Curated annotation (Swiss-Prot):
Subcellular location: Secreted
Tissue specificity as recorded in UniProt: Expressed by the venom duct.
Name by which UniProt lists this protein: Conotoxin PnMRCL-022
Family (UniProt): Belongs to the conotoxin T superfamily.
Signal peptide coordinates: 1-22
Keywords: Cleavage on pair of basic residues, Disulfide bond, Neurotoxin, Secreted, Signal, Toxin
A matching Pfam family: Chi-conotoxin
Organism name: Conus pennaceus
GO molecular function, one term: toxin activity
Cellular compartments per GO CC: extracellular region
Length: 60
């Protein structure tokens, strides 16, 4: 019987906690894809440049 008040208090505390949003907050992936495309383009340009002309690799 001594545990009953503690149990009731715990139930009240659990019920009064703020609810948590189940969906994670994520940023829009458009900027991530833009950055990935830009980086891929730079690496691709460097690779093609270095195949034909070595001096231009420093400038890209």
């Amino acid at each position: 019987m001594r545990c009953l008040p503690v149990f009731v208090i715990l139930l009240l505390l659990i019920a009064s906690t703020p609810s948590v949003n189940a969906r994670p907050k994520t940023k829009d992936l458009a900027s991530f894809h833009d950055n990935a495309k830009r980086t891929q383009h730079i690496f691709w340009s460097k690779r093609n440049c270095c195949i034909y002309e070595n001096w231009c690799c420093e400038w890209i």
